[in-house]
């Protein structure tokens, strides 16, 4: 049956009266980050692993960005704008893995972060948390909370698309700009997290408070500890599936925590209580889940919380100034 022009779905497909002529703010952020990291890649070409693949990857993403802009110019509707945003967000995983290639230029700093945790707490919470809380319910809840990270982002973006369309570009700009701000930190400050570092140096040394520097060890190693807790639940299997594409990178500060905080702020700013209180339990549990599964040190969580708020304030101010 043909779709009626006054139907609810038609407004997402009809041509916008004032379509965006240029690139969206989030696309400019991606292009700027692409340029910065391309310069690093070219200057350090002989020191990087597979630099040619890094360069071609950037060329492809630039081509995709321009192609989607052209398609939107031909069919400037709401759905096409959302598709532009969705495609860029679907590439975040590629960019995350790319930070591993770039930060291999620098020595690993896990020993510093692990030492900070030890000094603050007198132990390694990332080691003891899962050892003391082994009940299947605890394990399953925290595993599911951890993997709810990307669904939370999708829910926020979808809500703004369907219910706050005039604020969609601003909300997605803040999320994407914050992601790439985290990625820039990961590029320059390599921390892999307990599941990699503990595996590399051995649990015996960790238990005795010994945290040796391991230099460029992770340039040639990516072995990690298996997820702790109950091994026969849906959350565990989802976590294992996610870890299949993991890289020893991106632990400090925790982007999981930072982006979760940003999503909570965006949910609160939407003035929709149902949205906010729906994601609140998952977002809060992410704080604990990152330590439970040994993806992060506790210091990473605190840093992610603070940096997430800073990034929100920064990019929200930029969005308002640029009228996104």
Kindly label every feature range from the protein language model.
Residues 138-152, 247-268, 298, 302:
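Membrane-interface loop-to-helix entry segments
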Residues 188-269:
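Membrane-interfacial catalytic/cofactor-binding modules of polytopic membrane enzymes
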Residues 35-43, 91-98, 179-187, 283-292:
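Aromatic-anchored segments of alpha-helical transmembrane domains
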Residues 156-160, 257-275, 306-315:
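Membrane-interfacial alpha-helical segments at the cytosolic side of multi-pass membrane proteins
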Residues 82-86, 154-190, 195-209:
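Interfacial segments of alpha-helical transmembrane regions
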Residues 2-61, 79-153:
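N-terminal transmembrane-helix/juxtamembrane module of multi-pass inner/ER membrane proteins
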Residues 193-199, 251, 285-311:
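Interfacial helix-loop-helix junctions of multi-pass membrane proteins
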Residues 18-19, 48-53, 72-84, 160-171, ...:
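Membrane-interface helix-boundary motifs at transmembrane edges
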């Amino acid at each position: 049956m043909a779709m009626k022009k006054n139907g609810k779905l038609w407004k997402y497909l009809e041509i916008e009266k004032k379509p965006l002529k240029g690139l969206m703010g989030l696309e400019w952020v991606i292009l700027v980050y692409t340029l910065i990291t391309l310069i690093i890649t070219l200057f350090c070409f002989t020191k990087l692993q597979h630099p040619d693949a890094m360069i071609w990857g950037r060329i492809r993403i630039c081509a995709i960005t321009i192609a989607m802009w052209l398609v939107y110019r031909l069919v400037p509707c709401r759905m096409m704008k959302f598709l532009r945003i969705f495609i860029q967000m679907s590439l975040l995983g590629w960019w995350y893995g790319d930070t591993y290639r770039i930060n291999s230029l620098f020595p690993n700093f896990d020993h510093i972060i692990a030492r900070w945790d030890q000094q603050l707490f007198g132990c390694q919470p990332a080691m003891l948390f899962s050892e003391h809380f082994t009940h299947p319910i605890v394990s399953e809840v925290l595993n599911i909370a951890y993997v709810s990270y990307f669904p939370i982002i999708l829910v926020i973006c979808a809500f703004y698309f369907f219910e706050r369309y005039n604020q969609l570009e601003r909300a997605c700009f803040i999320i994407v700009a914050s992601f790439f701000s985290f990625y820039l930190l990961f590029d320059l400050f390599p921390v892999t997290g307990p599941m990699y570092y503990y595996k590399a140096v051995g649990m015996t040394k960790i238990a005795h408070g010994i945290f040796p520097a391991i230099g460029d060890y992770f340039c040639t190693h990516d072995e990690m500890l298996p997820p702790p807790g109950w091994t026969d639940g849906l959350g565990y299997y989802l976590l294992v599936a996610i870890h299949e594409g993991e890289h020893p990178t991106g632990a400090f500060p925790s982007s999981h925590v930072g982006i979760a905080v940003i999503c909570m702020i965006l949910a609160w700013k939407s003035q929709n209580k149902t949205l906010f209180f729906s994601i609140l339990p998952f977002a809060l549990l992410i704080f604990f889940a990152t330590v439970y599964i040994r993806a992060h040190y506790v210091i990473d969580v605190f840093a992610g919380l603070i940096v997430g708020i800073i990034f929100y304030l920064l990019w929200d101010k930029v969005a308002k100034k640029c009228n996104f």
